[in-house]
Amino acid sequence: MRILIVTPAPPRSRSGNRVTALRWARLLRGVGHRVDVAEVFERQRCDLLLALHARRSFPSIERYRRLRPTAPLILALTGTDLYGDIHTDPEAAGALDLADRFILLQPHGLGELAP
């Protein structure tokens, strides 16, 4: 499977989102997937979009969903998303609606999502 991981952190950044994206790319490649990491989705060929950070990746999430309405989209919710943005920012909340699945790494993250 060809996977595109979108993270708002630029290449050379040492932010948690970039480190996570690179780590996941390495793990996914290790099990046979073709993986690219980018700051934005710009019509790159991929079978799946995995986006980190709901608010900051929303333009990529929205574009991907518009261009590929049936392709899978996974959203990894960061601490900033869970404990702030998804409750106050319309784009972050919109990203939740567009995703097919979520990845939650925060211990109490599930409690932050509406039932």
What are these regions (language model features)?
Residues 48-50, 64-83, 101-104:
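Active-site proximal beta-strand in glycosyltransferases
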Residues 32, 46-47, 99-100:
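Short, well-ordered alpha-helix to beta-strand connector turns
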